[in-house]
Amino acid sequence: MAKDVITRALLRPIYKIYEKILWSQIKDGPFPFHVGIIPDGNRRWARNNRLPLDQGYYTGYVKLRDVLTWILEIGISTVTVFALSAENCEKRTQQELSMIFKYLKIGLDELLTSDLVHKYQVRVKAIGMLDKLPEDLKKLVVDLESTTEKYNKKKLILAICYGGRQEILDAIRKIMNDYKLGIIDSKSIDESTFRKYLYDQELSDIDLLIRSSGEIRISNFLLWHLAYSELFFVDVYWPDFRKIDLWRAIRSFQKRKRNFGA
C-alpha cells in the first residue's frame, strides 16, 4: 500500500500535464447534455487497499462530490447518478445498507446547503423505489427536492433503490390504469406518451454513460433513456476515478458519430 502511495505521488505531476492536454482537446465541445454515471467499485477498492468497507463507501462519496463539481464547472446540464440499485437495496446485508444510507444522508444533507447547488441553480430529484428508504432519508429527499424545485439551469438525478425494468413495469401499470379509466386510448400510446409515465417525464435521454471499475454492462440502469447513448467504461475503481478519466470519456464522446439507430 505504501508503494502505491509513493507511485501515485510520483505520477501526479504527469497526470496534471496530461489533464491539461486533454482539456485543450475537448474544451471547445460539443459536450454531452445528459451524463449518466455508474460509480462502481467502492467495495473492491476497499478490499484491494486492505481498508474497512466503510472507508470504501466514504471515499466513493467524496469522489462523487468531486466529479459532480467537475461536471457542473464545464457546463453539462444534466447528471444522473446510479446511487443504489433496486437489487442491492434488497440483497445487501443490513449492515452494508446502513453504511450506504449513512453516506447518502451525509450527501443529501450537503446538497441542501451546497454553494455549488445554488451557484449553478441545480434542481435535485430522486427516482426509484423510495419507499424502501429509512424515514429520515425519505424526509431529506422531500426537503431537497422542494428546496431546489425553483431551479431550472441544471439537473441532478439520484437513482436510489432504482431498477430500469421496474420503472418500465410501473409505467405500464399506470398506463393500463388510465386506459381502464378512459383517460387514454390505445391509439394515443406512443413514445412521447410512454415517457410521461416514467419516474421523471422531463428527463432527457442519456448522451454519455460512464461506468467505473472495468465492468462492461449497464446493470438495469435507465433502460429507456439509454437506447441511443454512447458508453464509456473506465478500468479504475470509483474512488480512484480522476479528472483525466472524465476528460477521456468526453473526448471519446466527441469523436463518435451519433446516428441514433439509423
UniProtKB/Swiss-Prot annotation:
Q: Which Gene3D superfamilies match?
A: Decaprenyl diphosphate synthase-like (3.40.1180.10)
Q: How is the cofactor bound?
A: Binds 2 magnesium ions per subunit.
Give the superkingdom in one word.
Answer: Archaea
PROSITE patterns documented for this protein: UPP_SYNTHASE
Q: Provide the disulphide bond pattern.
A: none
Binding site residues for substrate: G41, N42, R43, R44, W45, S85, A86, E87, R92, R211, R217, I218, S219
Q: Where is the active site?
A: D40, N88
Q: Which cofactor does it need?
A: Mg(2+)
Q: Where are the transmembrane segments?
A: none
Q: Name one Pfam family in it.
A: Prenyltransf
Assembly, in brief, is: Homodimer.
Q: What is this protein called?
A: Tritrans,polycis-undecaprenyl-diphosphate synthase (GGDP specific)
> Which organism is the protein's source?
Sulfolobus acidocaldarius (strain ATCC 33909 / DSM 639 / JCM 8929 / NBRC 15157 / NCIMB 11770)
